[in-house]
Amino acid sequence: LEEAVLGKTRCDDLPGAQVPERYFTYLKTGEFALLEDVLRHNFDDIQSLAELTAVICSAYRQPELLRYEQDILSVGKTLLHGRRTQQARNCLKILGHSTLAPQAHLYLASSYKQGREWTEAAELWKTMIAKGEGGAWPYIELAKYYEHVQHDYDIALRYATSALQYLLN
């Protein structure tokens, strides 16, 4: 993780798996020199955790600066789970024209539905259908929307039928 995210490589580091053995040997022998490598290893761990925390905080403050689309999607999902809805939506919208747009649209539309922001949800479901995203899901959601929110049963039936046709093909 240190190398992949922080670009740091440890030199002459005590492997973490050896730490318990060194510590227990120290307890038996009282030889403090055995702990020097352990303490350096732990210090490096703590320093790296602080640096990783700064990287993560930066990712949440400015997700648009993240290098990988998957990281942006992950930040958006985490913000949704943390009920930071507007920040999550802004984050997911960054992915609007990316290869992860279909997944981002699923989460974004679900967020609108959960917030009872029906116009935004319905428009996004229609966009998903137009782009061939989401499988039968946007058809099903639109069928429920037209049945339960708009009370337009003819349109609801059309979307339900389209969902069924999609699933049968």
Question: Each predicted region: which residue ranges?
Answer:
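DEDD superfamily 3′-5′ metal-dependent exonuclease/proofreading module
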Residues: 1-169
